[in-house]
Amino acid sequence: MGREILVDARGLEPPEPFEKVMDAVSDMGPGDMVLMLLEREPHPLYRVLDRNGYEHHTTFRDDGVLEIRIRLKHA
């Protein structure tokens, strides 16, 4: 079981959420997962993740926060 890396990007203005999550995913190892918290859906981020070998799953919480779980595709 790997690490869970939390990126709380709530309240941050672009491009800071993107920069923070890209720093976190670049530090991931096999089995690690990044959990990103955000108030808006980051469509540009999804495209970058897809192109670079990551899978992502987004859950919409009742409080308006999105939980985005990011893993390496081969992990």
Residue ranges and their predicted role:
Residues 2-7, 11-15, 19, 23, ...:
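Positively charged, polar, low-complexity stretches
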